[in-house]
Every structure is written in structure tokens, then in C-alpha cells.
Amino acid sequence: LKKSLQIGGAYVGIIVGAGFASGQEIIQYFTSYGNKGILGALLATLWFAFVGMCIAQISSRLQTTSHKDLIYQISGNTIGFLMDFVLSLFLFGVSVIMFAGAGATFEQMFGLPVWLGSICMIALTMMTVMMNVKSIINIIAIATPYLLAVVTIIAVYSIATMDLSFAEQATIAEQQLQTSSKSWWVTALLYMSFNIGVCFSLLTVMCGAIRNERIAGMGGIIGGLLLGALILLIHFSLLAKMNVIVGVDIPMLALANEIHPIVGLLMSFSLLGMIYNTAVGMFYSFTVRFFKPTKPSFKVAVIFMGGLGFLASLVGFTTLVSKLYAVMGYVGFILVGSIIFAWLRGIRRVV
């Protein structure tokens, strides 16, 4: 059970980046649908748990060491090559966004120059990535219960002090916020498929190191359920205070500061922790795609890619990645379909 909880915690830790923890993603994909957002959250939870279990079990069975091992097995050479290319570019791109985001967060919190904040995050990420995969799982998993505790405090406070009823708040949410689709269930599935693309690479590496399929699969289920719990907690926190947070850039931080500056500080560190988690997960997955962690060239590659990531964070590389986000949603659907089909077939290692 301990191993399954670690996998589940790391699964959550990879997906819960700054956009999730700040509340922006939850507003866009769930809360803007009012009460139907609850149904969307429940639908996404079921799919996160099921697909997470499928990835974990197949990866454990094939003993994968990078996403390449699994993608070509489940998708064939042509589609596999395209998905491998998009995923690899996406992993590096999200890493760069996290480095740039850390710089902006450090500037806002401590008044440090943006470049210095980025370098601090890159250095911390590189040191972590040079550890073995089991240590990385443990580090990423640690932040999950901390975030869960902070979000629970905010949710209890928001509901206890709400000015309007949930029905009135839902009306405000539906009227004033733009939605990415008119259908709550399509948006929920889009959110799931995109995030499976985000976590897929590290999840295959993590679970490839687990020999027991049942333990790995249980980790995927636990992670999916924890994600659902976080989505619902943040959704209710935001919906309860919709009349207060409309137009706010970081709504969860605004609610935390409303409780007490100390809670606001805890939330700020939580956001930094989520940026760090995502940066480590993406950067490690990208590097192991091309270099084996056991070889000396791996550490050299980590340092080189870290330097490249820093330069990319300064020269507007993030505009390219924003376009990749849209592509990743569609690639995510193909990926999810391939994973489920492979799981149903009971795919085995090709010797």
C-alpha cells in the first residue's frame, strides 16, 4: 500500500502544476459550468483513475524506462513516431514554462530578478533529476498531502463564509466566465486527455520500475481519486466565492490571503512546490527519452539541457509551447485510446 500511495502521490504531483493549484484551470474547465462542473469533475476523476491504472499496469508489465518504450508498442511505428516527437517537444516546452513561471513567482514573492528565480529553479530541478527514479517519486509525492491540507483549509473557509447561495454563485460563474466548450462533459474529457499527456512520460518511467502490476495499478487508481478530490475541493472553494474572485489572476492565493497572510504564504510556497514538481517530472522524462540515467552522459545532458532551458525561458519560447498545448489535447485523445486498447488486449513485452 505504501508503494501504491507513493505512485498515486507522484501522479498527482506531476499533473498539479501552477495552473491547477492557482485555481485558473479549475475555473476554466469546471467552475465556469456552475453546478454542472461537479459532474465534469466526477467524470474526469473516473477517467483519471481508470487511465492511470491502465498506464501503470502496462508500464509495470513491460518494465519501461522511457515513454518511447510504451508508445511504439501501443501505437505502431508511424503514429508512435509522431506522438513521440510531439510528447518530447511538449516535455521540454512545459519544463521551460515552469522555469519562466518560477522566475515570475520569485519576483512577485521576494522581489528577486526574474532570471535569478529561474536559475534557482533550474539548479534545484537539475540536482533532483540526477537522483534515481525512486528518489524522484518520493520527492514529488511529498508535496501532494501538503497541498491537499492547504486546499481543504481554503475550501472549509470559503463555504463557511460565502455571501450567496451556491445557486446564485453558479449563475455568476456561468454569466461572467468564458468556457472553452459549451458542453461540460467534452471539456472534462479534454482536460483529462491533456493531463494524461502531461503525466504519461514520468508515469511510464515510475511504474516501469515497479515489478508488481497490482501495486502499480492501485497507485494509478489512488492518484486518479486524489486528483478528483483536489478538483472538487478547489471547485467548491471557487464557486463559494465566485462573486469575490471574478477577474482575479490567482484566485486560490486571493482566498488564502483573505483567511490570513500566513495561509497566503503557505499557498505561495505550495504554488512554488507545484512548479518544482512539474519541472522535475517533465525535465526528467525528457532527458531519459534520449539518455540512459545509468550512463555518465546523462548528467552532462542534464546540465546542457538545463542551460538550454534557461535560454529558452528568456527568448519567448513559451509562445511556441502555448500552441503545443492545443495540439497536445488532440494527441492526448489518441494516446488515451491507444492505452485503453493495449490494456484490453493485455499487451506483453516483445522479446
Segments the model singles out, each with a brief description of its role:
Residues 2-21, 40, 87-91, 95, ...:
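Hydrophobic, membrane-embedded alpha-helices of multi-pass small-molecule transporters
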